[in-house]
């Protein structure tokens, strides 16, 4: 998202915004404040999360990321599978890198 925001985009519609809302807002605010070093740092961390959630079951991976941050867990409906154990581990690791586990707002502070 950083390159788009830096070029003047007024926002975005992406699953990553739902998967890591606090870090996504901080990224937006950093670009608007001209703090491109912080924005790029957040962008790189969000890319790690994006690579963990993007798959044929993106909705399930996004919901899993949300549940790790304190939102009530939900389930997938057939034929969509739940996030696999490998996907869950990658998502957890990416959220740890953002400081976003358990509803924490560390990434946004």
Which residues are covered by each model-predicted region?
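Structured C-terminal cap/extension of enzyme domains
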Residues: 2-109
């Amino acid at each position: 998202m950083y390159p788009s925001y830096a070029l003047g985009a007024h926002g975005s519609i992406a699953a990553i915004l739902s998967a890591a809302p606090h870090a996504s807002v901080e990224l937006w605010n950093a670009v608007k404040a001209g703090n491109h070093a912080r924005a790029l740092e957040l962008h790189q961390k969000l890319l790690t999360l994006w690579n963990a959630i993007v798959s044929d079951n993106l909705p399930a991976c996004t919901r899993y990321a949300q549940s790790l941050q304190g939102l009530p867990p939900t389930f997938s409906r057939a034929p969509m599978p739940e996030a696999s154990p490998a996907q869950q581990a990658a998502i957890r690791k990416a959220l740890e890198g953002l400081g976003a586990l358990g509803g924490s707002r560390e990434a946004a502070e």
